[in-house]
Design a protein with these regions (language model features):
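Short acidic/histidine-rich active-site segments
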Residues: 122-130
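Short, well-ordered beta-to-alpha junction loops that form the rim of enzyme active sites
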Residues: 20-22, 61, 127-128
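Conserved, mostly hydrophobic/aromatic
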Residues: 17, 60, 85, 114, ...
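Alpha-helical packing segments of well-folded alpha/beta enzyme cores
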Residues: 2, 6, 110, 147-154
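C-terminal helical cap(s) of enzyme catalytic domains, especially alpha/beta-barrels
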Residues: 135-162
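Residues that line or immediately flank small-molecule/substrate-binding pockets and catalytic motifs
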Residues: 82, 89, 126-127, 162
Length: 163
């Protein structure tokens, strides 16, 4: 219902609506668990059930790992439905929002999966926590340059691996 109500506006203004995978925590048990669209087959089902080109899947690669899924597997299941990415690294436990390559996710496999599906959508670095400890303008500028370099290298790798 929610997305269907927004569709007329999406068409009128040429804006795509993205349905993102989520996770949540069980504080009593001290565990992270899946939530809306954390199962890639469920995610694909929701996008398909609306059957409109203005609805795409947004895969937050960090959320997928926290929910017990490998991002590359989710990418392959979502395929052409995937229109937006939230890219950041984590340790499979915490939503770290740090630069790719600074924690434990398998970026070789993730970029390969994106190339395999011919990914053409948005590529958003969601790395705000990386910048939390940067104190000066100079450090922040260096951090932004590093983030841009990593993002460009990832995009170039995806493009060079496309079949």
């Amino acid at each position: 219902k929610y997305f269907n109500a927004l569709l007329p506006y999406a068409h009128e203004y040429g804006v795509k609506l993205a349905c993102e995978n989520m996770w949540c925590g069980d504080k009593k048990k001290g565990v992270r668990i899946g939530s809306a669209c954390s199962n890639p087959y469920e995610h694909a089902y929701y996008v398909d059930s609306i059957a409109d080109d203005m609805i795409v899947a947004c895969l937050d690669v960090g959320h997928s790992s926290i929910a017990g899924r490998e991002a590359q597997d989710c990418i392959r299941v979502l395929g052409k439905r995937l229109g937006a990415l939230h890219i950041h690294d984590n340790d499979y436990l915490d939503d770290m929002h740090t630069l790719p390559g600074l924690s434990e996710m398998n970026w070789e496999e993730i970029t390969r999966a994106l190339a395999d599906i011919g990914y053409e959508g948005d590529f958003t670095l969601e790395t705000d926590h990386f910048f939390d400890s940067l104190c000066t303008v100079e450090e922040t500028e260096c951090g932004l340059k590093l983030a841009a370099l990593i993002g460009r290298k990832m995009i170039n790798k995806i493009e060079s691996c496309k079949v």
